[in-house]
Amino acid sequence: MTALSRTPVFDAADTAALLDYPALLATLARTVADYAAGEIVSPERLVVPLQAGGVMLSMPSSAHDLAIHKLVNVCPGNAARGLPTILGQVIACDATTGEMRFVLDGPTVTGRRTAAVTALGVQALHGTPREILLIGTGKQAANHAEAFTALFPDARLHVRGSRAASAAEFCAAHRAHAPQLMPLDGDAIPDAIDVVVTLTTSRTPVYRDAAREGRLVVGVGAFTADAAEIAADTVRRSRLVVDDPAGARHEAGDLIVANVDWQQVASLADVLNGTFARGGPMLFKTVGCAAWDLAACRTARDALAAREQR
């Protein structure tokens, strides 16, 4: 029997069960601090072209306690083939011996840690939200609806899609896991909305409201330099925070298109350590990095250890 055959491999459902949102949020907060302190190595992701417009993404990261490698294939033509667009796994290894410890489902890790990073930013920059608007009706919106329900159970969740029907269908499909979900009534965003999260694949703005005190805007969907979900004027008039300063300079299209002064952009670590004082119109842009996948693997490792002690 090979070492690989002895390595536990968890599918999407089992991976989700290992990544409880409150535990993931707490581990992410510690990992953000470790990453900012230089205790985690997380190089820029390697992108390798596949056939028919697909790409293979290689994202390793290592710390004193764990090393991980996320390998994900994104194949846009898979929908027509009846296959998932995103396929991949995250391998967690002992940081000293290199032995493989377990393997998690890649898309599930990405989806849950992305939603948890958003929630961590909301908690740190805004506190407990009352009325949240999700713009988008795809998988990322579903992950965020589940995360917000777990972490902010008293908040009401509004959804706006490209069509009113898509928002209604999304709410009906996911209300069992997020009972506070409701379609936004009309296109205008009510003043009561205190957190807006953009979760689309649009390359042009889906959020154009003016920057305003008391409302946190979180940009999640845009991940290339020329794509922006949030209007440039809104970006320029907001106080800016990013999850990963290194990656944001290349991938945070909302900020790049707005031609922001990067010296004025704070990091999530700055917020968590008290260097950045919240207040005024604020915008939090996330681009993700392998260090956040490492946080997910730390969470899964701890969950597995807890199971063994029962």
Swiss-Prot record:
Its EC number is 1.5.1.49. The keyword NADP applies. GO terms for cellular component: cytoplasm. InterPro entries: NAD(P)-bd_dom_sf, ODC_Mu_crystall, ODC_N, Pyr2C_reductase-like. It comes from the Bacteria. Gene3D superfamilies: NAD(P)-binding Rossmann-like Domain, ornithine cyclodeaminase, domain 1. PANTHER family: KETIMINE REDUCTASE MU-CRYSTALLIN. This is Delta(1)-pyrroline-2-carboxylate reductase 1. It comes from Burkholderia multivorans (strain ATCC 17616 / 249).
